[in-house]
Amino acid sequence: MKRNSINIHHVTSFSSSPFWCVFFLVLLCKTSTNALVKQPPNETTPAIIVFGDSIVDAGNNDDIMTTLARCNYPPYGIDFDGGIPTGRFCNGKVATDFIAGKFGIKPSIPAYRNPNLKPEDLLTGVTFASGGAGYVPFTTQLSTYLFIYKPLLFLKGGIALSQQLKLFEEYVEKMKKMVGEERTKLIIKNSLFMVICGSNDITNTYFGLPSVQQQYDVASFTTLMADNARSFAQKLHEYGARRIQVFGAPPVGCVPSQRTLAGGPTRNCVVRFNDATKLYNVKLAANLGSLSRTLGDKTIIYVDIYDSLLDIILDPRQYGFKVVDKGCCGTGLIEVALLCNNFAADVCPNRDEYVFWDSFHPTEKTYRIMATKYFERYV
């Protein structure tokens, strides 16, 4: 076990027998998720409220000039309504937009910090998510990193999860002024809270920084992530949320940029990245199951997206895809955010043939499929 000397957060020791700990956690994960996958029957959903990273950011970083984790410029948004870049890290809608549409709430979930946000949008939900965010505070401080030959160029991040909660508190006060305290409490209680985060912690912070690997092993770092995710879910519960879904991390070792950087000459999926992700997901599911039992509230749910996306990657033709190892933007090998722009990168003519839009984020079609899979299992 490597000792923790970096000032990120205290990490509880992991067992000296990794095999049996992982085996136990897998069993606990299966028990917890099987018991908690469904939302309560006959519940209406007035709003969807989202926290997390670039997977569900809809433009909260647009005016933050200290980060490159923003995409409010073409070709981002090329397939969104009107072909306008919104700040979504995608060619069109993201998964939470499709989920909101399927619930019949609204066609898409706007960014809370959108200057054109209408008061009525607050009643049906917003996203506080920010590109570059992570469960480990240090992740958001790093946020975006560009591999420009050598060395790495590190830049300040977006909105940390702790700050996203501050924005949520501001949102609640606005709601109270609009509809009163009692209705605000009812909306929060019945709304669906979705937390989608963790990819940046694994790729950018742990595997991107040798100094972090020297002070944490995979077991202790994933424990840190899962413990912080549990704390975040508990905070939402304290705010009055009673329908909370915390999403696991996707198979980050298979996204195009990570294949390019660590997948070897043949750009294979990076096994050690995916193994770390799976270990984190198991711990996250176990933590959420434990939290639900502690609170006596069975509406805190772990949502798996690892298998959903991996199934698409491993069997793309089943879903109508042709390209899984490159993004649609530019060469598809490394372009993301600033490197994916109309001046330096061409866009593939048929986005629906690509699983990934840029080198890190899926296409609108992929998100649509994953939203459908989500509904089949969790709603």
UniProtKB/Swiss-Prot annotation:
One GO CC term, this protein: extracellular region
Predominant localisation class: secreted
Keyword Zinc-finger: no
CDD domains in the record: SGNH_plant_lipase_like
Entry keywords, A to Z: Glycoprotein, Hydrolase, Lipid degradation, Lipid metabolism, Secreted, Signal
Source taxon at top rank: Eukaryota
EC identifiers of the protein: 3.1.1.-
Residues of the active site: 54, 358, 361
GO molecular function (one): lipase activity
Localization terms from the record: Secreted
GO terms, biological process: lipid catabolic process
Signal sequence coordinates: 1-35
Glycosylation sites: 42
Family annotation (Pfam families): Lipase_GDSL
Gene3D superfamilies noted in UniProt: SGNH hydrolase
UniProt record similarity statement: Belongs to the 'GDSL' lipolytic enzyme family.
Protein name (Swiss-Prot/TrEMBL): GDSL esterase/lipase EXL2
Lineage: Eukaryota, Viridiplantae, Streptophyta, Embryophyta, Tracheophyta
